[in-house]
């Protein structure tokens, strides 16, 4: 069993003002995405300025935050927020959902592309390789917060999370680290290696949807579901799996459609 590093979730406290590591991880994700995007910008569109890129990253970040919050409300705890709608604004208490954030990013990309002469999938193909930076940073934030841990296990790398998070004090899968490794590191490598060569429009977006969906679906088998939801079917199906399955199907379809529309790219990939 590995010891859980006792990291204070509060990175900096100045009087009543507290800056949490989880919030800082959002800044790391946004900053990292901007840096990578700036390196890839000339290949995407040489006419775009760094200012336009900054505008894009800003609106994508807004999509993540607003969509992530509303996604959690709708998918994970709707009854509580219907009973007290003001809870929606208490973001410091947690409650963000990737799938909602993903929808927010898609809406932001569609809106920004429409205003700047880019199709939805042109922008999404550019954005997709940036996303794992934010995903990885977010999972580190979850780990520091000692939240979203996994099921009890006796694997050598199991961890006992702090009593405030897990009163049962059981050795558990560090599922946040699994997600960091898969959604952050592995997905980053897959997408950025794949996007190094010219690909037909929609293909990179399809690869993102496919592999994120697979990775999330798999990790859900060892991650404890949200207490207010539990398992939704057959004693093992979680909300995360239900939301990820359409991503897998959509990803396969987008990849197929991308290469069907561009037979030359399909031959080059063989």
Swiss-Prot record:
Keyword Cell inner membrane listed: yes
Entry membrane topology: Multi-pass membrane protein
Cellular component terms per the entry's GO annotation: plasma membrane
UniProt superkingdom: Bacteria
InterPro entries documented for this protein: Lgt
Chief place of localization: membrane
Signal peptide: none
Positions contributing to a 1,2-diacyl-sn-glycero-3-phospho-(1'-sn-glycerol) binding: 139
Known pathway: Protein modification; lipoprotein biosynthesis (diacylglyceryl transfer)
Compartments where found: Cell inner membrane
Coiled-coil segments on the chain, per record: none
TM stretches of this protein: 10-30, 56-76, 92-112, 120-140, 175-195, 202-222, 237-257
Gene Ontology MF annotations: phosphatidylglycerol-prolipoprotein diacylglyceryl transferase activity
Stored PANTHER family: PHOSPHATIDYLGLYCEROL--PROLIPOPROTEIN DIACYLGLYCERYL TRANSFERASE, PROLIPOPROTEIN DIACYLGLYCERYL TRANSFERASE
Function: Catalyzes the transfer of the diacylglyceryl group from phosphatidylglycerol to the sulfhydryl group of the N-terminal cysteine of a prolipoprotein, the first step in the formation of mature lipoproteins.
NCBIfam families the UniProt entry points to: lgt
Record family assignment: Belongs to the Lgt family.
Name of the featured protein: Phosphatidylglycerol--prolipoprotein diacylglyceryl transferase
Species the sequence originates in: Pseudomonas syringae pv. tomato (strain ATCC BAA-871 / DC3000)
Encoding gene per record: lgt
């Amino acid at each position: 069993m590995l010891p859980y590093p006792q990291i204070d979730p509060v990175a900096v406290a100045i009087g009543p003002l507290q800056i949490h590591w989880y919030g800082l991880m959002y800044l790391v994700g946004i900053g990292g995405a901007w840096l990578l995007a700036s390196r890839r910008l000339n290949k995407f569109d040489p006419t775009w300025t760094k200012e336009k890129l900054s505008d894009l990253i800003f609106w994508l970040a807004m999509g993540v935050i607003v969509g992530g919050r509303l996604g959690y409300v709708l998918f994970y705890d709707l009854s509580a927020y219907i009973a007290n709608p003001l809870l929606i604004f208490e973001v410091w208490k947690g409650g963000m959902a990737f799938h909602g954030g993903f929808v927010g990013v898609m809406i932001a990309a569609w809106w920004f592309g429409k205003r700047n002469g880019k199709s939805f999938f042109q922008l999404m193909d550019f954005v997709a390789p940036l996303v794992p930076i934010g995903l990885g940073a977010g999972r580190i934030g979850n780990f520091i917060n000692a939240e979203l841990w996994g099921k009890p296990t006796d694997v050598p790398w199991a961890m006992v999370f702090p009593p405030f998070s897990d009163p049962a004090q059981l050795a558990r899968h560090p599922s946040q680290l699994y997600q960091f490794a898969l959604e952050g590191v592995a997905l980053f490598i897959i997408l950025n290696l794949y996007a190094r060569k010219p690909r037909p429009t929609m293909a990179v977006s399809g690869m993102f949807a496919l592999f994120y969906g697979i990775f999330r679906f798999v990790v859900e088998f060892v991650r404890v579901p949200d207490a207010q939801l539990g398992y939704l079917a057959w004693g093992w199906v979680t909300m995360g799996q239900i939301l990820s399955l359409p991503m897998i199907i959509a990803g396969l379809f987008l990849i197929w459609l991308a290469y069907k529309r561009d037979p030359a790219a399909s031959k080059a990939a063989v």
